[in-house]
């Protein structure tokens, strides 16, 4: 059975929802899934004053455990067209894994959230994939196999590189049913492809 980690960073809970949906999809695809998050870097008093969702259930991951999985889906908030610093800080601690080649041929995939439609989602998806590529991981994108992202009748998440959600910072727009379905699709797709590669 494929062992998968869904690893995320979420300040306001939007990516937490997407990560849970991806984990559901991966389980539907036959994977044994672990859902974890990266540590918060913002001081607790600042996080509370900024209304961060600090009561997330997922346990905190450690960089060394990434080697324990066949596949890793990363979900991160976006800051100025890049992954959030919390995720970058976590990934920057994986140098020891890189030196050992511990993630070579593992499967990787990425999802992101932005506060606006043009908030740099595709840049964040691609730059996060770069980190995976430096580790020798095999990237499985969302791709246009996920037809739910097609159309412009409403704000739709998704890109060929990975699932996205646009969620307002004030909480007025949460991840849509289409975006959550896309995250499930991505989780299932990664699980199924990983099973073919590592089965």
Curated annotation (Swiss-Prot):
Binding site for FMN: 10-15, 78-80, 113-119, 134
Polar residues bias (residue ranges): 163-177
EC number: 1.6.5.2
Keyword annotations: Flavoprotein, FMN, NAD, NADP, Nucleotide-binding, Oxidoreductase
Cofactor binding notes: Binds 1 FMN per monomer.
Flavodoxin-like domain span: 4-190
Region of interest called Disordered, as start-end residue ranges on this chain: 157-181
Pfam assignment, any one: FMN_red
Keyword Amino-acid biosynthesis included in the entry's annotation: no
Residues that, per the record, bind substrate: 98
Catalytic activity: a quinone + NADH + H(+) = a quinol + NAD(+); a quinone + NADPH + H(+) = a quinol + NADP(+)
One cellular component term from this protein's GO annotations in UniProt: membrane
UniProt record similarity statement: Belongs to the WrbA family.
NCBIfam families per the UniProt record, alphabetical: flav_wrbA (TIGR01755), PRK03767.1 (NF002999)
Protein name per the record: NAD(P)H dehydrogenase (quinone)
Organism: Brucella melitensis biotype 2 (strain ATCC 23457)
């Amino acid at each position: 059975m494929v062992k998968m980690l869904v690893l995320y960073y979420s300040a306001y809970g939007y990516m937490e929802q997407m990560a849970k949906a991806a984990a559901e999809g991966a389980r539907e695809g036959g994977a044994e899934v672990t859902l974890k998050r990266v540590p918060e870097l913002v001081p607790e008093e600042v996080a509370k004053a900024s209304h961060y969702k600090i009561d997330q259930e997922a346990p905190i991951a450690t960089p060394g455990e990434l080697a324990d999985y066949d596949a890793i889906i990363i979900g991160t908030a976006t800051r100025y067209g890049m992954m959030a610093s919390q995720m970058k800080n976590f990934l920057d601690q994986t140098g020891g894994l890189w030196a050992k080649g511990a993630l070579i041929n593992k499967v990787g995939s990425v999802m992101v959230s932005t506060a606006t439609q043009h908030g740099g989602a595709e840049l964040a998806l691609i730059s996060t994939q770069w980190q995976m590529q430096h580790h020798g991981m095999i990237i499985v994108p969302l791709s246009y196999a996920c037809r739910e992202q097609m159309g412009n009748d409403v704000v739709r998440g998704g890109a060929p590189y990975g699932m996205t959600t646009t969620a307002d910072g004030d909480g007025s727009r949460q991840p849509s049913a289409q975006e959550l379905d896309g995250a499930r699709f991505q989780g299932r797709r990664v699980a199924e492809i990983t099973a073919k590669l590592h089965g």
